[in-house]
Amino acid sequence: MLNIVLFEPEIPPNTGNIIRLCANTGCQLHLIKPLGFTWDDKRLRRAGLDYHEFADIKHHHDYQAFLDSEKLDSTQPARLFALTTKGTPAHSAVSYQANDYLLFGPETRGLPAYILDALPAQQKIRIPMQADSRSMNLSNAVSVVVYEAWRQLGYPGALLKE
């Protein structure tokens, strides 16, 4: 199972859409606080529809609590990929493995330097875009990367019709 990690997400409909994505792809969702909304926000519920009960969601007090809980060592982060416009390899150049962690920053500011600086260059990846584009919508970016990783893994758990 792939792991989607949202660091301090700010916009409830984006997180709701990602909850629905997790329910449909079997990904586990990790939410690192503080969140920019309350967990009972109507916009979050509306975007996620009734998929909340089908998604595996873990809340973490902060980034260090996430690393500790998931037994990831920030000095040797194994299979933790940060999505950033500052990354070099494209998301499609990674050979994904089950249980990889895909880390996304908040919508308005991206991941902080202390997180990016702790990761090796090959674990800071980007989604290719036009040169004059700043970034993609968070829920769209998560979908792009998750479906590429899931495709590489052979869509485990998916209902495929040949």
UniProtKB/Swiss-Prot annotation:
GO terms for cellular component: cytoplasm. Keywords: Cytoplasm, Methyltransferase, S-adenosyl-L-methionine, Transferase, tRNA processing. GO terms for molecular function: RNA binding; tRNA (5-carboxymethylaminomethyluridine(34)-2'-O)-methyltransferase activity; tRNA (cytidine(34)-2'-O)-methyltransferase activity. It catalyses: cytidine(34) in tRNA + S-adenosyl-L-methionine = 2'-O-methylcytidine(34) in tRNA + S-adenosyl-L-homocysteine + H(+); 5-carboxymethylaminomethyluridine(34) in tRNA(Leu) + S-adenosyl-L-methionine = 5-carboxymethylaminomethyl-2'-O-methyluridine(34) in tRNA(Leu) + S-adenosyl-L-homocysteine + H(+). S-adenosyl-L-methionine binds at L83, G105, I127, S135. SUPFAM superfamilies: alpha/beta knot. It is found in: Cytoplasm. Pfam families: SpoU_methylase. Its EC number is 2.1.1.207. One of its GO terms (biological process) is wobble position cytosine ribose methylation. Belongs to the class IV-like SAM-binding methyltransferase superfamily. RNA methyltransferase TrmH family. TrmL subfamily. HAMAP family: tRNA_methyltr_TrmL. NCBIfam families: PRK10358.1, tRNA_yibK_trmL. Methylates the ribose at the nucleotide 34 wobble position in the two leucyl isoacceptors tRNA(Leu)(CmAA) and tRNA(Leu)(cmnm5UmAA). Catalyzes the methyl transfer from S-adenosyl-L-methionine to the 2'-OH of the wobble nucleotide. Homodimer. This is tRNA (cytidine(34)-2'-O)-methyltransferase. It comes from Yersinia pestis. The gene is trmL.
